[in-house]
Amino acid sequence: MKHFHLKVKEVIEETSDAVTISFWHPLSEMIKYQAGQFLTILLTIDSEKVRRSYSMSSSPHTDTAPAVTVKRVPGGLVSNWLIDHVKEGDFLEVLEPMGHFQVLPDARNVRTVVLIGAGSGITPLMSIAKSVLKVETESRVVLLYGNRAEEGIIFKKQLDEMSRAYGNRFNVYHSLTQPSNDWKGGLGRLDKSMIVATLEEIGGVKETTTEYFLCGPDGLMETTKEALLAWGVAEERIHRESFATATTHPVHEADEDDDSLKMQEIKVRYEGEEYTFNVAPHQTILEAALELDIDLPYSCQAGMCTACMGKCTSGKVLLDEEDGLTKSELAQGYILTCVAHPLTKGVVIEIE
């Protein structure tokens, strides 16, 4: 996995609690990425090594400088540090862009792309919108975007400018839960009825070529997915990205004679090396590796970003969280080490 030390080109204040950080490309090569992917930033804060993934708000098709947008999280170690300390000319260590939540625009496409998000969930959706509108000149983009108040709408000015520039090819629908008296947009939280009613009012978004991309709080994405499925949208056309961060993994139930309650020796093959180590009951494979200073790839530690994806070629594992993988990937034996527990003896994981 490639590491880069990127020089900060500019820090732009989007709202009172969100900034966009753009970077110069390294002299040796261009940073390559797809619309919707994320960048993982590696920092040392108060002697603690930390890493966080931030979706790229720039588009590889419209922006010369790669950029991420960071929203302040109350009590959040990394988001607060980045917003309070990073300035033009600083260098940040990052991993190469990653993530399956992406769009590969094709000039031959004629379709509708529906984007539904809230708060900082707009970040990858912005990248997707700019890319599709630029490359697919016959396609249309629809954005449903929920926020608390107008002053908290990230990219408000850019979205307005894009609406004017692209006309009926870019339809933006804002909804606020705490609007001002002069607000003329939508009111209330994006719920099932509002989402379906808005899409029906727009019209032309139910064709089999339409793709749906969701990003925001888990509750919103679950609600939206349920609404779309009930509305008749095929599940394979619904794509989602979560901004989850590491949490305590739930303990899975097991019988006393279940091997999952025993220390398991496993093997992990990565970058030409084979590591053999023990994983304690209720410990994830990644947690065990990091305790031994085995430098496996990872980012979110919540089973969503897929940076730690590997393939289980022997034995069985249990995943605390499966939403980060497709059904096809699960069927092929792919796992995420940050949420994976060995269930049997002889577990072997191969990481590309």
Question: Where are each of the predicted segments found?
Answer:
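Iron-sulfur (Fe-S) cluster-binding segments and ferredoxin-like electron-carrier domains
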Residues: 288-292, 307-352
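Iron-sulfur (Fe-S) cluster-binding modules
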Residues: 1, 7, 13, 17, ...
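Active-site proximal loops enriched in glycine and acidic residues that flank catalytic Cys/His/Asp
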Residues: 174, 216, 224, 242, ...
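FNR/FR-type flavoprotein reductase catalytic core
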Residues: 80-258, 265-267
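C-terminal accessory/binding modules appended to enzymatic or scaffolding proteins
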Residues: 261-304
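Ferredoxin-reductase
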Residues: 2-95, 108-111, 139, 147-150, ...
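Ligand-binding loop in jelly-roll beta-barrel domains
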Residues: 60-64, 106-109, 136, 342-352
